């Protein structure tokens, strides 16, 4: 009979097969009350599952990460229960857990409305109040088919067909409602009280737009009301920081139906874009990169030779001219190899670092487009380093330092790094992979950084390091990458002459710091809520007169600011100064300069910040020095 070993080493003996819940009850009623599931011999199981042999056991509660995932998964089933009660004609599809929540895909003859979502949420609450047990039954395959046939659940039957090897399946009963799942699930609906449905969207069966359209109901669930309230507050803050909303309010950009996934940059937004480009241009020049420019449209044969046509064709925009097929480039790497291939290269020439602000286009699904964060036309701060195997380590180490310095300039101090290593299917010999992986790991260690290993997650052509930023809301954005490539130089005949006067292929390092300009600007907008640091602000100063008699002097101040490289405007409207200050504050302009008769007479300006802090009266030269100092500090400078 089983001996159960607990995480603290204590052991409990039983003279009969025992369930996870029974073990919890033997430890104490408080633990049993909070038991969601168990981890038996490192495998998650339901609280009702029996343990028949000597085993290790961890009791899973809502405080555990796995417990929270189980709560969310069970909430998805609860959506199904409520939907079938309110809309019997609905056909249930799948309801998985996602980051911080869950969704359920449902076939309906007509779309759900927001009122429908509210009604579903209300019904879920009533079902939770009934405090019923969730019953698990392992059911033979034939009986599972009969259950879903009798209920007319055709999508569930299709899912059963996808699992021909399964002889028995777990059915979970929420009263009269039944769903199919590997589990585990909560033992009782009392664990599901802290949830909220968040939105409705469209989806397709199996994610294929050629298939029938489904309705997707999203929700979130947490261990308690406090966690739920904190999440809702964070989401509300994220909505207030939505780059699309701020982009419109600050006249930065717009999108329109005639060019889906393409950005119409307005003057203010384009100013931010240009600041980024000029900054990255200088950074790359200072670090030994040569800036190049390659064609937008390239004969399709190059993409066939590079391998992109075989693996990426559906995401490429193509065109035809004079009996030739072309593709609008979705990435820059094959073109950079063409530049490298011009002229004979020696080992003495390496490393060669080629950088391009490459404009790329990818035919992303329309449903995935999101403001300037997910677009079809974008520009990358793209570069490729051609080097010898022995140079990988130094190039990666230099890139890591450069990348972290750039992120600090934009105000991002917390950066996560992940090293992805060889997958099972790969090109290149093991010795080359050993060298590359060690070079990347050593570079991370030498920088004194914490990093996460992702075994088997590298591309088939080489290992990589990914850099992810954490913003002010704790959200993580993957931006930078450096990727070893042993494949493309071979496919595109890149070579150099070695010290032994032989031909060899260089290693190609794909690298980007910002990723795409469009997405990075979106991240900046949301991180700063539009209150950009002075160096990134489209307008750094607005000069305002109190009466018409100061208009000429105000224009002279603006002219001097511009002569000194500041981005400045004037507001000479015949409005009260308080009104003008309020309006320009809403535009998030860092500095507001006011001129009255006294300032004109003394040759000074009265300076206040967009947060309302009065910096007092100072000379124009002193103000110029103040702004230049703020700009020099970049993202480290906070306008009070």
UniProtKB/Swiss-Prot annotation:
Annotated localization: Cytoplasm
The protein's Enzyme Commission number: 6.1.1.3
PROSITE patterns linked: AA_TRNA_LIGASE_II (PS50862), TGS (PS51880)
Domain (TGS) ranges: 1-61
Family annotation (Pfam families): HGTP_anticodon (PF03129), TGS (PF02824), tRNA-synt_2b (PF00587), tRNA_SAD (PF07973)
Known partners and oligomeric status: Homodimer.
Record-given protein name: Threonine--tRNA ligase
């Amino acid at each position: 009979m089983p001996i159960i070993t607990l995480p603290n080493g204590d052991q409990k003996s039983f003279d009969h097969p025992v369930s996870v819940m029974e073990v919890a009850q033997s430890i104490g009623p408080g633990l049993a009350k909070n038991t969601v599931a168990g981890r038996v011999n490192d495998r998650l199981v339901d609280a009702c599952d029996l343990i028949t042999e000597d085993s290790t056991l961890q009791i899973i509660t809502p405080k555990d990460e796995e417990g929270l995932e189980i709560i969310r998964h069970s909430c998805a089933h609860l959506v199904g229960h409520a939907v079938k009660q309110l809309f019997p004609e609905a056909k249930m599809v799948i309801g998985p857990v996602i980051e911080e929540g869950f969704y359920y895909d449902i076939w309906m003859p007509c779309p759900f409305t927001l009122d429908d979502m509210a009604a579903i949420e209300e019904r879920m609450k009533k079902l939770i109040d009934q405090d019923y047990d969730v019953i698990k039954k392992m059911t033979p395959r034939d009986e599972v088919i009969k259950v879903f046939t009798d209920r007319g659940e055709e999508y569930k039957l299709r899912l059963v067909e996808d699992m021909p090897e399964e002889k028995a399946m777990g059915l979970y009963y929420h009263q009269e409602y039944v769903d199919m799942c590997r589990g585990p699930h909560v033992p009782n609906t009392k664990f599901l009280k802290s949830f909220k449905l968040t939105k409705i969207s469209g989806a397709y069966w199996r994610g294929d737009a050629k298939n029938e359209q489904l309705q997707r109901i999203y929700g979130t669930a947490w261990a308690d009301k406090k966690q739920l309230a904190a999440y809702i507050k964070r989401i509300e803050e994220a909505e207030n920081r939505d780059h699309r909303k701020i982009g419109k309010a600050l006249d930065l950009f717009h999108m329109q139906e005639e060019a889906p996934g393409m950005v119409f940059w307005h003057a203010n937004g384009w100013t931010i874009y240009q600041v980024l480009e000029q900054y990255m241009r200088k950074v790359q020049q200072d670090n030994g990169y040569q800036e190049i420019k390659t064609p937008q449209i390239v004969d399709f044969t190059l993409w066939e030779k590079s391998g992109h046509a075989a693996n990426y064709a559906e995401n490429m925009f193509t065109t035809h001219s004079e009996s030739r097929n072309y593709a609008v480039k979705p990435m820059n790497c094959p073109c950079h190899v063409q530049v490298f291939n011009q002229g004979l290269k020696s080992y003495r020439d390496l490393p060669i670092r080629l950088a391009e602000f490459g404009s790329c286009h990818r035919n992303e699904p329309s449903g995935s487009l999101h403001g300037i964060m997910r677009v079809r036309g974008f520009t990358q701060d793209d570069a490729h380093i051609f080097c010898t195997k022995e140079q990988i380590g130094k190039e990666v180490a230099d890139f890591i330092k450069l990348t972290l310095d750039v992120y600090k300039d934009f105000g991002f101090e917390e950066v996560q790094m992940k090293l992805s290593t060889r997958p099972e299917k790969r090109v290149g010999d093991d010795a080359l992979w050993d060298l590359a992986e060690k070079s990347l790991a050593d570079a991370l260690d030498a920088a004194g950084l914490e990093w996460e290993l992702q075994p088997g997650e590298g591309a088939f052509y080489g290992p990589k390091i990914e850099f992810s930023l954490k913003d002010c809301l704790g959200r993580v954005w993957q931006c930078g990458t450096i990727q070893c490539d042993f494949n493309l130089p071979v496919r595109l005949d890149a070579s150099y002459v070695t010290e032994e006067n032989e031909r060899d292929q260089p290693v190609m390092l794909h690298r980007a710091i910002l990723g795409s300009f469009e997405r990075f600007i979106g991240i900046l907008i949301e991180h700063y809520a539009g209150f950009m640091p002075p160096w990134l602000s489209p307008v750094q100063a607005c000069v305002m007169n109190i009466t018409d008699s100061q208009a000429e002097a105000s224009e002279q101040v603006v002219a001097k600011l511009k002569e000194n490289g500041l981005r400045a405007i004037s507001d000479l409207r015949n409005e009260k100064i308080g009104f003008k200050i309020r309006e320009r504050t809403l535009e998030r302009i860092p500095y507001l300069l006011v001129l009255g008769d006294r300032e004109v007479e003394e040759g000074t300006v009265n300076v206040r910040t967009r947060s309302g802090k009065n910096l007092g009266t100072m000379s124009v030269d002193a103000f110029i020095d103040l702004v230049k100092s703020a700009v020099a500090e970049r993202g480290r400078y906070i306008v009070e």
